[in-house]
Amino acid sequence: MALKSKFLVGSILATFILNGFSSPAQALELDEDTRTVTLDGKGNTVVLSVEQIKRGKRLFNNACAICHVGGLTKTNPNVGLDVEALSLATPPRDNVSSLVSYLKDPMTYDGADSIAELHPSIKSADIFPKMRSLTDEDLFAISGHILVQPKVVNEKWGGGKIYY
Protein backbone atom coordinates (compact mmCIF):
# COMPACT_ATOMS: atom_id res chain seq x y z
CA MET A 1 0.00 0.00 0.00
CA ALA A 2 2.83 2.42 0.84
CA LEU A 3 4.43 1.72 -2.55
CA LYS A 4 1.21 2.76 -4.35
CA SER A 5 1.07 5.99 -2.34
CA LYS A 6 4.69 6.83 -3.12
CA PHE A 7 4.11 6.08 -6.80
CA LEU A 8 1.01 8.31 -6.86
CA VAL A 9 2.77 11.19 -5.10
CA GLY A 10 5.78 10.81 -7.41
CA SER A 11 3.55 10.82 -10.50
CA ILE A 12 1.71 13.94 -9.38
CA LEU A 13 4.94 15.72 -8.54
CA ALA A 14 6.51 14.76 -11.89
CA THR A 15 3.44 15.99 -13.77
CA PHE A 16 3.53 19.30 -11.93
CA ILE A 17 7.23 19.76 -12.57
CA LEU A 18 6.99 18.88 -16.27
CA ASN A 19 3.80 20.81 -17.03
CA GLY A 20 3.49 23.39 -14.30
CA PHE A 21 6.66 25.31 -15.02
CA SER A 22 6.64 25.18 -18.81
CA SER A 23 3.24 26.66 -19.65
CA PRO A 24 3.49 30.02 -21.47
CA ALA A 25 0.21 31.12 -19.90
CA GLN A 26 1.61 30.47 -16.45
CA ALA A 27 4.85 32.30 -17.14
CA LEU A 28 2.99 35.04 -19.03
CA GLU A 29 5.85 35.55 -21.44
CA LEU A 30 3.48 36.71 -24.15
CA ASP A 31 4.73 38.79 -27.06
CA GLU A 32 3.00 41.94 -28.27
CA ASP A 33 1.22 40.13 -31.11
CA THR A 34 -0.33 37.66 -28.65
CA ARG A 35 -1.38 40.49 -26.35
CA THR A 36 -3.05 42.44 -29.20
CA VAL A 37 -6.83 42.04 -29.31
CA THR A 38 -9.69 43.75 -31.12
CA LEU A 39 -10.95 46.72 -29.13
CA ASP A 40 -14.23 47.51 -30.88
CA GLY A 41 -16.52 46.70 -33.78
CA LYS A 42 -14.60 49.10 -36.04
CA GLY A 43 -11.53 46.84 -35.96
CA ASN A 44 -9.39 49.04 -33.72
CA THR A 45 -6.94 47.05 -31.64
CA VAL A 46 -5.33 47.39 -28.23
CA VAL A 47 -2.19 45.82 -26.80
CA LEU A 48 -2.91 44.51 -23.32
CA SER A 49 -0.21 44.78 -20.69
CA VAL A 50 1.04 41.65 -18.96
CA GLU A 51 -0.53 43.03 -15.76
CA GLN A 52 -3.94 43.37 -17.46
CA ILE A 53 -3.72 39.78 -18.66
CA LYS A 54 -2.76 38.50 -15.21
CA ARG A 55 -5.55 40.50 -13.62
CA GLY A 56 -8.07 39.35 -16.23
CA LYS A 57 -7.14 35.72 -15.66
CA ARG A 58 -7.46 36.05 -11.88
CA LEU A 59 -10.81 37.84 -12.12
CA PHE A 60 -12.13 35.41 -14.75
CA ASN A 61 -11.15 32.44 -12.58
CA ASN A 62 -12.90 34.02 -9.59
CA ALA A 63 -16.09 35.30 -11.22
CA CYS A 64 -16.59 33.35 -14.46
CA ALA A 65 -14.77 30.01 -14.45
CA ILE A 66 -17.41 28.27 -12.35
CA CYS A 67 -19.46 28.11 -15.57
CA HIS A 68 -16.86 28.91 -18.24
CA VAL A 69 -13.81 26.81 -17.38
CA GLY A 70 -11.62 26.43 -20.47
CA GLY A 71 -13.86 28.77 -22.46
CA LEU A 72 -16.78 26.36 -22.37
CA THR A 73 -20.30 27.18 -21.21
CA LYS A 74 -21.60 24.55 -18.80
CA THR A 75 -25.23 25.61 -19.14
CA ASN A 76 -25.11 25.58 -22.97
CA PRO A 77 -22.17 23.61 -24.40
CA ASN A 78 -23.11 24.75 -27.93
CA VAL A 79 -22.07 28.34 -27.15
CA GLY A 80 -18.50 28.70 -25.95
CA LEU A 81 -16.13 31.62 -25.55
CA ASP A 82 -14.07 30.77 -28.63
CA VAL A 83 -13.62 33.55 -31.19
CA GLU A 84 -15.91 31.92 -33.77
CA ALA A 85 -18.83 31.60 -31.34
CA LEU A 86 -18.29 35.15 -30.09
CA SER A 87 -18.19 36.54 -33.65
CA LEU A 88 -21.44 34.79 -34.61
CA ALA A 89 -23.43 36.28 -31.72
CA THR A 90 -25.78 39.20 -32.35
CA PRO A 91 -24.27 41.67 -31.90
CA PRO A 92 -20.81 40.13 -32.35
CA ARG A 93 -18.96 39.79 -29.04
CA ASP A 94 -15.49 39.25 -30.48
CA ASN A 95 -14.00 42.49 -29.17
CA VAL A 96 -13.29 44.05 -25.79
CA SER A 97 -16.02 46.72 -25.97
CA SER A 98 -18.81 44.30 -26.82
CA LEU A 99 -17.71 41.83 -24.13
CA VAL A 100 -17.65 44.63 -21.54
CA SER A 101 -21.19 45.60 -22.62
CA TYR A 102 -22.25 41.97 -22.31
CA LEU A 103 -20.77 41.70 -18.81
CA LYS A 104 -22.73 44.79 -17.81
CA ASP A 105 -26.06 43.67 -19.32
CA PRO A 106 -26.01 40.21 -20.97
CA MET A 107 -28.30 39.41 -23.88
CA THR A 108 -29.29 36.13 -25.49
CA TYR A 109 -27.03 34.84 -28.27
CA ASP A 110 -29.39 36.29 -30.89
CA GLY A 111 -29.47 39.65 -29.06
CA ALA A 112 -33.25 39.58 -28.65
CA ASP A 113 -33.65 39.44 -24.86
CA SER A 114 -31.85 40.42 -21.68
CA ILE A 115 -30.66 37.49 -19.56
CA ALA A 116 -29.38 39.63 -16.68
CA GLU A 117 -31.46 37.67 -14.17
CA LEU A 118 -29.93 34.38 -15.34
CA HIS A 119 -26.34 35.33 -16.19
CA PRO A 120 -23.97 37.08 -13.78
CA SER A 121 -23.56 40.73 -14.72
CA ILE A 122 -23.15 44.19 -13.28
CA LYS A 123 -26.88 44.74 -13.83
CA SER A 124 -27.66 41.70 -11.67
CA ALA A 125 -24.97 42.22 -9.03
CA ASP A 126 -27.62 42.02 -6.30
CA ILE A 127 -28.18 38.32 -7.06
CA PHE A 128 -24.65 37.54 -8.30
CA PRO A 129 -22.41 38.92 -5.53
CA LYS A 130 -19.12 38.16 -7.32
CA MET A 131 -20.01 40.89 -9.81
CA ARG A 132 -20.59 43.60 -7.17
CA SER A 133 -17.10 44.94 -6.86
CA LEU A 134 -16.03 44.67 -10.51
CA THR A 135 -15.08 47.97 -12.11
CA ASP A 136 -14.96 48.89 -15.81
CA GLU A 137 -11.21 48.28 -15.62
CA ASP A 138 -11.90 44.79 -14.25
CA LEU A 139 -14.41 44.06 -17.03
CA PHE A 140 -11.84 45.26 -19.59
CA ALA A 141 -9.23 42.88 -18.13
CA ILE A 142 -11.66 39.93 -18.09
CA SER A 143 -12.66 40.63 -21.70
CA GLY A 144 -9.01 40.86 -22.71
CA HIS A 145 -8.31 37.53 -21.03
CA ILE A 146 -11.17 35.88 -22.94
CA LEU A 147 -9.82 37.19 -26.27
CA VAL A 148 -6.16 36.31 -25.57
CA GLN A 149 -6.85 32.72 -24.52
CA PRO A 150 -7.41 31.33 -28.06
CA LYS A 151 -3.92 32.60 -28.93
CA VAL A 152 -2.40 30.97 -25.86
CA VAL A 153 -4.15 27.58 -25.70
CA ASN A 154 -5.32 27.44 -29.35
CA GLU A 155 -8.33 25.23 -30.08
CA LYS A 156 -8.54 24.08 -26.47
CA TRP A 157 -10.19 27.39 -25.51
CA GLY A 158 -13.89 26.80 -26.05
CA GLY A 159 -13.06 23.65 -27.99
CA GLY A 160 -15.07 21.24 -25.91
CA LYS A 161 -14.60 18.43 -23.47
CA ILE A 162 -12.34 16.44 -25.81
CA TYR A 163 -9.51 18.76 -24.77
CA TYR A 164 -10.02 18.47 -20.99
UniProtKB/Swiss-Prot annotation:
<dbReference type="GO" id="GO:0009523">
    <property type="term" value="C:photosystem II"/>
</dbReference>
<keyword id="KW-0472">Membrane</keyword>
<dbReference type="Pfam" id="PF14495">
    <property type="entry name" value="Cytochrom_C550"/>
</dbReference>
<feature type="binding site" description="axial binding residue">
    <location>
        <position position="68"/>
    </location>
    <ligand>
        <name>heme c</name>
    </ligand>
</feature>
<dbReference type="GO" id="GO:0009535">
    <property type="term" value="C:chloroplast thylakoid membrane"/>
</dbReference>
<feature type="signal peptide">
    <location>
        <begin position="1"/>
        <end position="27"/>
    </location>
</feature>
<comment type="function">
    <text>One of the extrinsic, lumenal subunits of photosystem II (PSII). PSII is a light-driven water plastoquinone oxidoreductase, using light energy to abstract electrons from H(2)O, generating a proton gradient subsequently used for ATP formation. The extrinsic proteins stabilize the structure of photosystem II oxygen-evolving complex (OEC), the ion environment of oxygen evolution and protect the OEC against heat-induced inactivation.</text>
</comment>
<keyword id="KW-0732">Signal</keyword>
<keyword id="KW-0793">Thylakoid</keyword>
<dbReference type="InterPro" id="IPR009056">
    <property type="entry name" value="Cyt_c-like_dom"/>
</dbReference>
<keyword id="KW-0249">Electron transport</keyword>
<dbReference type="GO" id="GO:0009055">
    <property type="term" value="F:electron transfer activity"/>
</dbReference>
<feature type="binding site" description="axial binding residue">
    <location>
        <position position="119"/>
    </location>
    <ligand>
        <name>heme c</name>
    </ligand>
</feature>
<dbReference type="InterPro" id="IPR016003">
    <property type="entry name" value="PsbV_cyt_c550-like"/>
</dbReference>
<dbReference type="InterPro" id="IPR017851">
    <property type="entry name" value="PsbV_cyt_c550"/>
</dbReference>
<dbReference type="InterPro" id="IPR036909">
    <property type="entry name" value="Cyt_c-like_dom_sf"/>
</dbReference>
<dbReference type="GO" id="GO:0019684">
    <property type="term" value="P:photosynthesis, light reaction"/>
</dbReference>
<keyword id="KW-0349">Heme</keyword>
<keyword id="KW-0934">Plastid</keyword>
<keyword id="KW-0813">Transport</keyword>
<keyword id="KW-0604">Photosystem II</keyword>
<keyword id="KW-0408">Iron</keyword>
<protein>
    <recommendedName>
        <fullName>Photosystem II extrinsic protein V</fullName>
    </recommendedName>
</protein>
<dbReference type="GO" id="GO:0020037">
    <property type="term" value="F:heme binding"/>
</dbReference>
<feature type="binding site" description="covalent">
    <location>
        <position position="64"/>
    </location>
    <ligand>
        <name>heme c</name>
    </ligand>
</feature>
<dbReference type="InterPro" id="IPR029490">
    <property type="entry name" value="Cytochrom_C550"/>
</dbReference>
<keyword id="KW-0602">Photosynthesis</keyword>
<feature type="binding site" description="covalent">
    <location>
        <position position="67"/>
    </location>
    <ligand>
        <name>heme c</name>
    </ligand>
</feature>
<comment type="subunit">
    <text>PSII is composed of 1 copy each of membrane proteins PsbA, PsbB, PsbC, PsbD, PsbE, PsbF, PsbH, PsbI, PsbJ, PsbK, PsbL, PsbM, PsbT, PsbY, PsbZ, Psb30/Ycf12, at least 3 peripheral proteins of the oxygen-evolving complex and a large number of cofactors. It forms dimeric complexes.</text>
</comment>
<keyword id="KW-0479">Metal-binding</keyword>
<comment type="similarity">
    <text>Belongs to the cytochrome c family. PsbV subfamily.</text>
</comment>
<dbReference type="GO" id="GO:0005506">
    <property type="term" value="F:iron ion binding"/>
</dbReference>
<keyword id="KW-0150">Chloroplast</keyword>
<dbReference type="GO" id="GO:0022904">
    <property type="term" value="P:respiratory electron transport chain"/>
</dbReference>
